[in-house]
Amino acid sequence: MSLADSVLAVNNDLPIRTDNPVHSGKVRSVYWLTDADSRRLIQTKGYNVPEDTPLAIMVISDRISAFDCIFHGEGGLKGIPGKGAALNAISNHWFKLFAENGLADSHILDIPHPFVWIVQKARPIKVEAICRQYITGSMWRAYSKGERVFCGITLPEGLEKDQKLPDLLITPSTKGILTGIPGVPAQDDVNISRSDIEANYQAFGFEKVEDIDLYEKLLKDGFKVIAKALADLDQVFVDTKFEFGYVTDKNGNSKLIYMDEVGTPDSSRIWDGAAYRDGKILENSKEGFRQFLLNHFPDPDILLNKDRMPEREALARDNALPLEAMMDVSRTYTGIAEKVTGAAIPLPANPKADIIKILREEYDLIV
């Protein structure tokens, strides 16, 4: 079995029984189960949700995206070995820690395989919940050009690149393209302020205006739980993105939960603590891959300029990246996952076959 065979690049073609089209994201694919299968699993597996809750199988891939494009490597390598299992393992660890600290639940009900979650359907908040403890990345680039107001928050003068901010900042952006909201352009990933959300809370998916306080509390509390755990590993939690949604509990009450993934190298910046104290930035996140791409291609503006998207897509499609660069990313992801979880990350030789076998034999979901 070759290295390329161990990578799960295509994850939307599994023979899972469903009445709906498979939803394919950049990294995960979602298979919505039939009503009958959802009810059967809730009953037989004892999931703590109402019996009519829609369930889905969420399968992660090893694909790697950056600058809104999917990249590949030499030798037919269509993803990063170990990446999918590492992301899921890290999220699983943080969600468990959140529960131990009395924070909200997540959408995950079951983990049949390192690449697979069984999740409950949620009503998503249409906000990318971003939290920043250090000034770097896009915020630093804007600050260095003279901008001082970010998402309604005014930053002080005299900040330096990569320094710790005086306060933990919440800098939300839109999730998807939202129309008809005053002052908010109908574009994906637009920065918004808390006042934007308060004035249009229902358009952003909040059921009550008071839930804005709850979402901010869950965001900050979750950030602090992860930051403390990473600090114990001499890692710096720089910034991150969370997602939230509503589910209905067994008593018919609506509750806010964490969704998607949390505290991973895909959704966060994580720096090595020793290197940071020495004045250097050693990335333990996807930011290192982004920096590699900017240095690898002769014209980095293609990757940064949204007006050059056709060129960027061609660049990603037509250029196989060096194998060593792909393996560097693999070592970053599996390394930080093993630090966080304290366990080796499983790398199945044929993940797709393993997933099908488990979902057939233990869940009766394969057609």
From Swiss-Prot:
Organism: Shewanella sp. (strain MR-4)
Main EC class the enzyme belongs to: ligase
Name of a matching Pfam family: SAICAR_synt
Chain's gene name: purC
Keyword Heme: no
Keyword Transport in record: no
Reaction(s) this enzyme catalyzes, per UniProt: 5-amino-1-(5-phospho-D-ribosyl)imidazole-4-carboxylate + L-aspartate + ATP = (2S)-2-[5-amino-1-(5-phospho-beta-D-ribosyl)imidazole-4-carboxamido]succinate + ADP + phosphate + 2 H(+)
Pathway stated in the Swiss-Prot or TrEMBL entry: Purine metabolism; IMP biosynthesis via de novo pathway; 5-amino-1-(5-phospho-D-ribosyl)imidazole-4-carboxamide from 5-amino-1-(5-phospho-D-ribosyl)imidazole-4-carboxylate: step 1/2
InterPro entries named in the record: SAICAR_synt/ADE2_N (IPR028923), SAICAR_synthase_Vibrio-typ (IPR014106), SAICAR_synthetase_CS (IPR018236)
Assigned protein family: Belongs to the SAICAR synthetase family.
Any GO molecular function: phosphoribosylaminoimidazolesuccinocarboxamide synthase activity
Entry's Gene Ontology cellular component terms: cytoplasm
PANTHER family for this protein: PHOSPHORIBOSYLAMINOIMIDAZOLE-SUCCINOCARBOXAMIDE SYNTHASE (PTHR43700:SF1)
Keywords from the UniProt entry: ATP-binding, Ligase, Nucleotide-binding, Purine biosynthesis
GO biological processes: 'de novo' IMP biosynthetic process
Organism classification: Bacteria, Pseudomonadati, Pseudomonadota, Gammaproteobacteria, Alteromonadales
Name of the protein in its database record: Phosphoribosylaminoimidazole-succinocarboxamide synthase
EC annotation from Swiss-Prot or TrEMBL: 6.3.2.6
